[in-house]
Amino acid sequence: IKAAYSLIVQNMKELTDASLPENIEKDIKDIVGMEQGVSELHNLRTRRIGNAVSIEMHVRMDGSMSLYEAHAHATVIEHSLRERFGGNAYINIHFEPIKKNGKYENPKKERHQ
């Protein structure tokens, strides 16, 4: 009965789009935090899709970074997460510039003033 209950609970979590366990989300935060330049990870959403995991997040980095540099950081983060969670993991990273005084800083605007 205990084994059947465990299977039912696990499957219900998948069917109801439940987040992955806290220790798994901590692993994700640790992996992302190891990437140089990451200021903050927020809006982390995780779930299981069949035998794969889905990881969506917002990451704050230096706003003066080029698109090429941001893409390189995303590639490193995605590779590290796939090493941990498997090659079929769905990973979506949304980059945002670091906020100062509650607002996004625009480095180009500041340079031209």
Q: Model-flagged regions — what are they?
A:
Residues 1-113:
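Alpha-helical transmembrane segments and adjacent TM-loop junctions that form the membrane-embedded core
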